């Protein structure tokens, strides 16, 4: 297990997806490693696909913060199988902060910042 804590927020898709034959798939829970990557892209982990990268915009538009019951199986997988020492942060708070950063950087780059 990691010695250092890894900050993570858990999100779940707002809508179910359809499989290749039209079957309704369960909504995927994604762990977002909030201190990784840059202001737009974050490392993430899901049962399906495991480690990857996700856009902050995707999290904001397609997901909502997961409840403990929803994210507990993924959290246990990350801790017990992968070996993370997790510190769970509030997803709604993190997303509000992250989207604020995206807007500030975009405004600065476009010359709209004061």
Annotate each PLM feature.
Residues 59-114:
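Mixed-charge, Lys/Arg-enriched low-complexity segments
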Residues 4-18:
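Tryptophan-anchored aromatic micro-motifs
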Residues 1, 42, 105-106:
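Intrinsic-disorder/low-complexity regions
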Residues 17-20, 35, 47-50, 81, ...:
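Intrinsically disordered, low-complexity segments enriched in small/polar residues
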Residues 20-72:
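Acidic, low-complexity, intrinsically disordered interaction modules
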Residues 1-3, 114:
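Basic/polar N-terminal segments that are highly enriched at the extreme N-terminus
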């Amino acid at each position: 297990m990691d010695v250092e804590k890894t900050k993570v927020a858990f999100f779940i898709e707002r809508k179910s997806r359809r499989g290749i034959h039209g079957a309704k798939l369960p909504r995927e829970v994604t762990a977002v490693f909030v201190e990784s990557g840059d202001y737009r892209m974050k490392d993430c982990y899901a049962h399906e696909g495991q480690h990857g990268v996700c856009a902050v915009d995707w999290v904001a538009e397609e997901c909502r913060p997961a409840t403990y019951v929803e994210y507990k199986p993924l959290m246990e997988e990350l801790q017990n199988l992968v070996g993370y020492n997790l510190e769970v942060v509030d997803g709604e708070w993190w997303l509000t902060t992250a989207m604020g950063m995206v807007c500030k950087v975009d405004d600065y780059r476009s010359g709209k910042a004061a």
